[in-house]
Amino acid sequence: EISAPQARPGSSGPGLRVSSSAVRQALAAGDMQGAARLLGRPYAISGHVVHGRKLGRALGASSAEAGDGFRTLNLRFAHWKPAASGIFAVLVHGLSNAPLPGVANLGVRPSLNPHDVNGGRVLLETHCLTWPADLGPEGAYGKIVRVELLHKLHDELKYDGLDALTAGIAKDCADARAYFASAHALTLTSLHTETRRQTTRDRI
């Protein structure tokens, strides 16, 4: 079950009615700041963390059996064609007392087999740049998290093999860290810093 801010037709501004088409256009263009201004908070996706192939934890791991690579949170998306897609710098709420910075892929994972365990469905796959030690490798499954999409890094890319995919994810992590280290990130993170359960179904 995925939930996210629902735009209401009308005027713009926090707490006021906004154009849902304007929000969709901003998301499609990768203008996450524009979408956040219209919604009054960063665009977010919420849901239960589900099991996937567990491929991420093997990519970039310190050893073959370590499982300490790019551990990811998988959320199935309700729509086949979400307004936003690509790779994003994100904040994850619900795993610890403070939101966790991360990098996320929202889309169909073109580098992997579309007939895998997820059946080619749209997924939000999020790698937290820091992982809470008390969760352990399996502790996030079943938890409800909210992932705020703050900044689009680039569109989805198709990599030639797992080595290229691993290098691409590593670069995305570095770019996300650079984003969070910049003053630019403060504008969006200040909009919404407290965990709040969303009850509005995503219509965007």
What are these regions (language model features)?
Residues 1-40:
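Contiguous mid-protein beta-loop-alpha structural module that forms a pocket-lining wall or clamp
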Residues 36, 46, 99-101:
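Acidic/polar loop patches that form or flank catalytic/metal-binding clefts of enzymes
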Residues 50-204:
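Phosphate/ribose-recognition catalytic cores of enzymes acting on nucleotide-derived substrates
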Residues 4, 48-50:
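Proline- and acidic/polar-enriched loop/turn elements at helix boundaries
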